[in-house]
Amino acid sequence: MAARLALRGGPGAAGQRPWLLLAPLLLVPLLARPAEALVEGLYCGTRDCYEVLGVSRSASKAEIARAYRQLARRYHPDRYRPEPGDGPGGAPPSAEAFLLVATAYETLKDEETRKDYDYMLDHPEEYYSHYYHYYSRRLAPKVDVRVVILVSVCAISMFQYFSWWNSYNKAISYLATVPKYRIQATEIAKEQGLLKKAKEKGKNKKSKEEIRDEEENIIKNIIKSKIDIKGGYQKPQVRDLLLFQVILAPVHLCSYIAWYCRWIYNFNIKGKEYGEEERLYIIRKSMKMSQSQFDSLEDHQKEMFLKRELWIKENYEVYKQEQEEELKKKLANDPRWKRYRRWMKNEGPGRLTFVDD
């Protein structure tokens, strides 16, 4: 028995005693975790937001709002009268008290922020996670991204609409100065008696300039009604605006898929012969022209394309080569191009040198 006691009291027992003494110290961080949950720089800092407002964690939003209004009236800088020891939860009586109350209310009034705050109080060990959630919410955009996109699309559509109308009116004003169209429009106006009516209405009431402006507007209106402008200066259509293009995008996508499937089935699988519409489509794609650009071409040009069978690749390559040769001939006979070539030959473009004089 004495031998057993001697063994228990030997050097091994002495080595274990420090660990027994350190065990209570190791429990201290575990017991101190609720205090460590309050981190400076997050939410209310080292103060508990619930204690700042004087409410419990189970308080409703109405109770939190009521407590905030009472404390805000009490500690507002315009109303606050300092008293010894005054302040929420024992805080110093200053403008910081009002900011602390406002911060506590902003933290607890939002459901998502309140959940993050409660989670921080319950899980203080997740230190970096709390920082991430806190700053991700603070730095997140306050405005819905969908609203921003919608407003941007509407603004771009409005700019498009007014810009297109401006271009269209400029084109009409230009056509009104071209003798060919102006004479035709004037004859139509005379046949309809519009110019005579304008002069009668302006008799003894309007000046010559006003009568001239009215006649000019009549000619422009006739040109608008008789001439179909195509291309970039065509009359604006609401369906071409970006807003309507975005709205109708699913419809256009479904239409394109259906059209593509019909194309594959009719011409690739069944081997049908191309119709006029399909031939013009292939020609337009070969020329790398948009639909509006191709529509602006004259009808006799399209007939020439069909007559030369340009939808066939070999025929189009021959036509392309001819156009390039014709362009070279035009440039060779162009006086401006000749001057440019002489200048390049004699002087050439300026050079940048780094040689010291």
Swiss-Prot record:
Membrane topology label: Multi-pass membrane protein
GO biological process: protein folding
Superkingdom in the source lineage: Eukaryota
InterPro entries on file: DnaJ_domain, DNAJC25-like, J_dom_sf
Keyword terms: Chaperone, Membrane, Transmembrane, Transmembrane helix
Compartments, record wording: Membrane
A single GO cellular-component term on record: membrane
Pfam family, one: DnaJ
Intrachain S-S bonds: none
Sequence intervals crossing the membrane: 19-39, 147-167, 241-261
The keyword Chaperone is assigned to this record: yes
PROSITE patterns the record matches: DNAJ_2 (PS50076)
J domain location: 48-121
PANTHER family found in the cross-reference section: DNAJ HOMOLOG SUBFAMILY C MEMBER 25
Family, as annotated: Belongs to the DNAJC25 family.
Designated name of the protein: DnaJ homolog subfamily C member 25
Organism of provenance: Mus musculus
Higher taxonomy: Eukaryota, Metazoa, Chordata, Craniata, Vertebrata
